[in-house]
UniProtKB/Swiss-Prot annotation:
Function (record text): This is one of the proteins that bind and probably mediate the attachment of the 5S RNA into the large ribosomal subunit, where it forms part of the central protuberance.
Annotated Pfam families: Ribosomal_L18p
CC terms in the record's Gene Ontology section: cytosolic large ribosomal subunit
GO molecular function: 5S rRNA binding; structural constituent of ribosome
Organism (species): Symbiobacterium thermophilum (strain DSM 24528 / JCM 14929 / IAM 14863 / T)
Recorded family membership: Belongs to the universal ribosomal protein uL18 family.
Assigned keywords, A-Z: Ribonucleoprotein, Ribosomal protein, RNA-binding, rRNA-binding
Organism lineage string: Bacteria, Bacillati, Bacillota, Clostridia, Eubacteriales
Gene name as annotated: rplR
SUPFAM superfamilies per the UniProt record, alphabetical: Translational machinery components (SSF53137)
Record has RNA-binding as a keyword: yes
Domain of life: Bacteria
GO biological process, one term: translation
Assembly and interaction partners: Part of the 50S ribosomal subunit; part of the 5S rRNA/L5/L18/L25 subcomplex. Contacts the 5S and 23S rRNAs.
InterPro entries: Ribosomal_uL18_bac-type (IPR004389), Ribosomal_uL18_bac/euk (IPR005484)
Protein name from the UniProt record: Large ribosomal subunit protein uL18
Length: 123
């Protein structure tokens, strides 16, 4: 019997519980965050049609050129937040619903959110 806590399984349960109430609409799409050890990804999603409007990650050339070191730190997350906000504003999206996907609002997730707010997204 496995007694050690599977962190990703627990995160997934939190994510599914929150996703019952958090939905993106055309007026306020959902800003979703995915965090891996080496990278961070952000998508703005309209859940009514199931379509990603804009996205950014540490793998994008625009972000990668501004990175110094790893893509798995708070500085990289802040750059991704700024880039996704600029792309969203260019696509006509100003207000979003933040979906932290079961991650704690701390560290890289918080850095991405704060940078997106400073760049002009409202949530």
């Amino acid at each position: 019997m496995i007694k050690k806590l599977d962190r990703n399984k627990a995160r997934r349960k939190r994510q599914l519980r929150v996703r019952k109430t958090v939905h993106g609409t055309p007026e306020r799409p959902r800003l979703n965050v995915f965090r891996s050890n080496q990278n961070i990804y952000a998508q703005i999603i309209d859940d009514t049609v199931g379509r990603t409007l804009v996205s950014a990650s540490t793998l994008d050339p625009e972000v990668r050129s501004r990175l110094q070191g790893s893509g798995g730190n708070k500085a990289a997350a802040a750059i991704v937040g700024e880039v996704v906000a600029k792309r969203a504003l260019a696509a006509g999206v100003t207000k979003v619903v933040f979906d932290r996907a079961g991650y704690l609002y701390h560290g890289r997730v918080a850095a991405l959110a704060e940078a997106a707010r400073e760049a002009g997204l409202e949530f």
